[in-house]
Regions:
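C-terminal peripheral helix-coil segments that are non-catalytic and often amphipathic
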Residues: 1-11, 107, 139-150, 175, ...
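Basic, helix-initiating cap at the start of DNA-binding domains
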Residues: 1-37, 41-50, 67-70
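Amphipathic alpha-helical linker/stalk segments
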Residues: 14, 72-99, 141, 146
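Short hydrophobic/aromatic patch on the recognition helix
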Residues: 51-62
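Hydrophobic alpha-helical connector segments
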Residues: 71, 85-114, 162-166
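Amphipathic alpha-helical packing segments from all-alpha helical-bundle domains
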Residues: 78-81, 126-153, 160-165, 175, ...
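Helix-loop "lid/cap" segments that line or gate small-molecule binding pockets
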Residues: 87, 103-110, 121-124, 149, ...
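Amphipathic alpha-helical segments used for helix-helix packing
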Residues: 106-128, 176-179
């Protein structure tokens, strides 16, 4: 991976694109620059320079910088939805479901830290967009909690609030890692985070 100053070859990993393609380099360069400077502060010229492509190449793949920025967010948002959906369908109990969901969030954070952190930072910008049929991992989690309440596996309460409480116990450590306060892999801490999330969900 190229370093933060982009002095060498661009990172070839794609977000939605095939690794090694021009589109992949554009996505990865934009991701890194958006993380460093914010979406609004980055120009398409800077993205093109970091990706080592002509500026016009960006518009062959994305209608605008904002479309590119949103596409990066939606990619990890959809990825988390798929991971959570699988975790919930494979779970044998409520406790197992909590452990699995925490595990897949930690897995996603470790597999592509830059993309996961981008999702975390830009949730307020893109996460509030209302679009029919949009896959939403948090909705899946809240619905699972509501079912657990109906089945007596979780104390009654507001499923959305409990989902926020449980996810916060995963996402805040991820934010600490992003700030350099928590070294190491998220998956290493997954058992402790799952235990804490389950305790929060079981609280009256």
């Amino acid at each position: 991976m190229a370093n933060d100053a982009f002095p060498g070859a661009p990172d070839p990993r794609g977000v939605t694109a095939v690794d090694g393609t021009a589109k992949a380099r554009i996505e990865r360069a934009a991701l890194m620059l958006f993380a460093q400077e914010g979406v609004d502060a980055v120009s398409t010229r800077e993205i093109a320079s970091a990706a080592q492509v002509a500026e016009g190449s960006i518009y062959r793949h994305f209608k605008s910088k904002e479309v590119l920025a949103e596409a990066l967010f939606e990619a990890i948002h959809s990825r988390l939805f798929d991971l959570v959906e699988t975790a919930l369908s494979d779970a044998e109990s409520f406790e197992d479901a909590v452990t699995r969901v925490v595990g897949v969030y930690c897995q996603a954070a470790d597999e592509d830290p830059a993309l996961f952190e981008y999702h975390l930072i830009h949730m307020f910008r893109f996460g509030r967009i209302d679009r029919d049929g949009r896959p939403d991992p948090v909705t899946l989690i809240a619905e699972a909690i509501a079912r657990a309440m109906e089945n007596g596996d979780c104390p009654p309460g507001d499923p959305e609030l409990k989902a926020a409480m449980a996810l916060g116990l995963v996402l805040q450590p991820a934010a600490h890692r992003m700030a350099g306060r928590l070294p190491g892999l998220m998956t290493t801490n997954a058992p402790a985070l799952a235990h804490a999330a389950l305790a929060a969900l079981k609280a009256d």
